[in-house]
């Protein structure tokens, strides 16, 4: 099993040459998104048509209570590289992490983005502090609760990026002094129902695939937790390459063991794959690797209640289910 991730030399050479996406690279990206959406590679032309005909969708990317890990995951996308993604696939009109503006200039950039006549997709990364009126989380003197409700109310669609935004995540872990909660719960009084792209961090393909689905088919079908079924419709366990060892009752006794390196099941080392819905085994990260293949048990990071409900990690705290 591979424990390393290497960026293909040809990909680096192409990026160093001029940073532009060729037609072939663009269609490859569309194919990756189409497969992740469950449509198959044959849907790639439709994805390409949507992105080209409708123009690059404007994205207003807000940051709440978070570690910026979801943005970091997106920034480390290599197929395509993030600059190609921002300049040729979406129009990232506001994002505090990567924008040059700061202070009042950043505030003006946000207000300009909100006046876009073509509309915009609002993405919120991070939980929203609500205790004492939300004073524990502010941007430019305005509480995140107030600002995000205002930005989200005018959006064509709202996407909660990551588990903190989806369900509160580690920001809502006990004792949760700021009263942090997920976007859906925080903005429900304003009639806002976001699409939850859960994960810590989520796969960038799931985010881009959701944007493409909004362009091509409108609102995707969501599960009971507000996640797109096309990405979160199957458990990690049912897609895992180690599943055959689970069926054979072959469980790795330790992380350093020969059995773990040979691909035996990590369930007794705390793997939450049987209880976690995500497409990590098929989408992988940068189409190269994912935690369980690399030897780390799934910790259920895309599930409601993560962090508290699934701790302690790396311990077999549940019995093997007959349904697993």
From Swiss-Prot:
Cofactor binding annotation: Binds 1 [3Fe-4S] cluster.
Short name of any one Pfam family annotated for the protein: Oxidored_q6
Protein's GO biological process: anaerobic respiration
Residues that bind [3Fe-4S] cluster: 280, 298, 301
Signal peptide boundaries: 1-49
One GO cellular component term: periplasmic space
Residues at which [4Fe-4S] cluster 1 binds: 67, 70, 164, 200
Database matches in InterPro entries: Cytochrome-c3_hydrogenase_C, NADH_UbQ_OxRdtase-like_20kDa, NiFe-Hase_small_C_sf, NiFe_Hase_small_N_sf, NiFe_hydrogenase_ssu, TAT_signal, TAT_signal_bac_arc
Descriptive protein name: Periplasmic [NiFe] hydrogenase small subunit 2
Organism: Nitratidesulfovibrio vulgaris (strain ATCC 29579 / DSM 644 / CCUG 34227 / NCIMB 8303 / VKM B-1760 / Hildenborough) (Desulfovibrio vulgaris)
């Amino acid at each position: 099993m591979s424990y390393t991730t290497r960026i293909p030399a040809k990909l680096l050479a192409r990026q160093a040459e001029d940073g532009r996406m060729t037609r072939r690279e663009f269609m490859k990206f569309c194919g990756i998104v189409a497969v992740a959406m469950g449509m198959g590679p044959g849907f790639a032309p439709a994805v390409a048509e949507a992105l080209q005909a409708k123009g690059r969708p404007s994205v207003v990317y807000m940051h709440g209570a978070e570690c910026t890990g979801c943005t970091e995951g997106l920034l480390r996308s290599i197929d395509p590289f993030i600059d190609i993604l921002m300049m040729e696939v979406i129009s990232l009109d506001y994002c505090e992490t990567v924008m040059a503006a700061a202070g009042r200039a950043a505030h003006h950039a946000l207000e300009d983005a909100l006046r876009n006549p073509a509309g915009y997709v609002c993405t919120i990364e991070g939980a929203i502090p609500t205790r004492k009126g939300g004073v524990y989380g502010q941007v430019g003197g305005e509480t995140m609760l107030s600002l995000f409700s205002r930005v989200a109310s005018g959006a064509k669609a709202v996407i909660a990026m990551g588990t903190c935004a989806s369900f509160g995540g580690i920001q809502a872990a006990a004792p949760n002094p700021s009263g942090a909660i997920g976007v859906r719960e925080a903005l429900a009084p304003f009639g806002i129902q976001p699409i939850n792209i859960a994960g810590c961090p989520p796969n960038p393909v799931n985010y881009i695939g959701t944007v493409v689905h909004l362009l091509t088919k409108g609102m995707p079908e969501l599960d009971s937790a507000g996640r797109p079924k096309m990405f979160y419709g199957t458990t990690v366990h049912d897609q895992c390459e180690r599943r055959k060892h689970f069926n054979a009752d072959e469980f790795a006794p330790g992380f350093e063991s020969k059995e773990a390196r040979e691909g035996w099941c990590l369930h007794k080392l705390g793997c939450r794959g049987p209880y976690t819905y995500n497409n990590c085994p098929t989408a992988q990260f940068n189409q190269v690797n994912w935690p369980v293949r690399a030897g780390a048990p799934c910790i259920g990071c895309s599930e409601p209640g993560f962090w508290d409900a699934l701790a302690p990690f790396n311990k077999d705290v549940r019995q093997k289910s007959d349904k697993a």
